[in-house]
From Swiss-Prot:
Pathway listed: Polyol metabolism; myo-inositol degradation into acetyl-CoA; acetyl-CoA from myo-inositol: step 3/7
Superkingdom of origin organism: Bacteria
Protein name: 3D-(3,5/4)-trihydroxycyclohexane-1,2-dione hydrolase
UniProt organism field: Geobacillus kaustophilus (strain HTA426)
Top-rank EC class of the record's enzyme: hydrolase
Molecular function (Gene Ontology), one example: thiamine pyrophosphate binding
Family assignment from sequence similarity: Belongs to the TPP enzyme family.
Source organism phylogeny: Bacteria, Bacillati, Bacillota, Bacilli, Bacillales
Amino acid sequence: MKTIRLTTAQALVKFLNQQYVEFDGHIQKFVKGIFTIFGHGNVLGLGQALEEDPGELEVYQGRNEQGMAHAAIAFAKQKHRRQIMACTSSVGPGAANMVTAAATASANHIPVLLLPGDTFATRQPDPVLQQIEHWHDLTVSTNDAFRAVSKYWDRISRPEQLMSAMIQAMRVLTDPANTGAVTIALPQDVQGEAYDFPESFFQKRIHRIERRVPAKAAIHEAVELIRRKKKPIIICGGGVRYSEAAEELKQFAEKFHIPYGETQAGKSAVESAHPYNLGGIGVTGNLAANIIAKEADLVIGIGTRYTDFTTGSKQLFQHPEVEFLTINVSVFDACKLDAVRVVADAKLALLALTEELEKIGYRSGYTNEIDIAKKAWEEELNRLHHVRYRQSGFQPEVAGHLDEVLTEYSEFFDSSLTQTEVIGAINEWIDDDAIIIGAAGSLPGDLQRMWVARRPNTYHMEYGYSCMGYEIAGALGVKMAEPDKEVYAMVGDGSYLMLHSELVTSIQEKKKINVLLFDNGGFGCINNLQMGHGMGSFATEFRYRNEETGRLDGSLIPIDFAQSAAGYGVKTYKVHTLEQLKEALEDAKQQSVSTLIDIKVLPKTMTHDYESWWHVGVAEVSRNPKIAEAYKRKEQQLQRARKY
């Protein structure tokens, strides 16, 4: 057996350079590059290997470990999980910063390879800088925190362990049904240890991402179920995008007269204008999709995890005889809601179902319900686009909460802009092939409902983990995946303050992104939640502490986000009117450097509920009668929800 003597880190880099994937006959390099923030736990091991011979791996310098890992996740998501970035950090806090990102990847079924440095395998210098000592177990380090949020986890305590660990790592990273975060912890001494690795370990490896063929019996059972149903609805999930099954979905809907709603992950798999596309469904769904869903007697979920936001906490589907049919590559997800399951690739399953349903001449029983629902939403959408603030008699979309202080906000911001009119204007004024990115706050709800995707794969929402701070890092990752497209991070002031450090990386790499920052003076989404369930506005607005009350109910805190970003070298704009917004968007298109548009919008002017309910915990006992009433409403709604 021929061998080559390398350090563990050098062998890892050499191995990663030889990984390829094949999908539908197309072969491409799997690991494009590696994000790094070097520290004592990785710079002299993996850092040395990357400096000496990175191969074709592109090395990027992150600014925050969570941020760079989120950029890697967004890159892989935009690449439909067929190309990834790796990420390496030092020990301790650097590694811990990536734990949140690992959870984001695993929750969304997005592959990311995390390579945190670790403490010494020999334990000679224990406790090393940034090590946590556990008296009961000296094998435990910060990196064990990744176990709960990784789809595969390993620690390389000896150089020869790298071989079996990386084979398993690639298995998970290239498996559509089980992919997510893969964490390979690298003790800093082992990174530099040499070993005679077999040359065969470094051979070119092609990992075939195979389309799982549906079983004939499963297709037969699904056809018999559909045959009995008059008003089915399809849920278009992220699996439709990753399977590239958009055309098959459109043809299926058209042939059998079946409408479909979109999840956050599935939105823009098909353009919004398709006649059977109802738009967003569920808690953050629109009027059309949710009206049809309530009366559906069959729900056909394609590539969806059926999260509470999609199912309205299992209360959205109210037909007394509603049943579920699920197409998913994951057996775990296919079993949810006690569904009839077709465990298969979305495209192949749709083709098989189409063939069999054509044989029996199936067509749904809808008459004009789809058109009526879509027209109702189009009228509502037009209204939202034209919501204008006025001091006298204005009714905000989320009414009854902060009505009395809207004038204060308008004067403080020197703005009368509403969030819905701004979103409508942006949707009209940016390029049709531009890509928007979002994750948290009130914007995901507004965007799932209101955004019209005119081109496929132009809507990129991280809503599996809804991680605040994903937006700007995610925009960088999307830009790296789609360098010829304009990319827009749709971010609230709360998320911006949480994490925006990869703006600097975008400047460094000359990867222009556009940040559209909606400043409404607080955590508006959660303010809606607390006030909608009987609480007052408590620690969710950005206000000074009031010396008289001792609470955070003083005057509003002025924050100049444009000035903040300008310090990094970002081209910035301040927007208080629609005219200024249009000018800023047009000028931003001409820039070669990253931009930020600071948009002052009024609170409570985001969209609100449309025929949906969300199950959240409410205090069963309280001196506040409004909270007691909220608990009563929750219990009443829960009676209408499925139990499992």
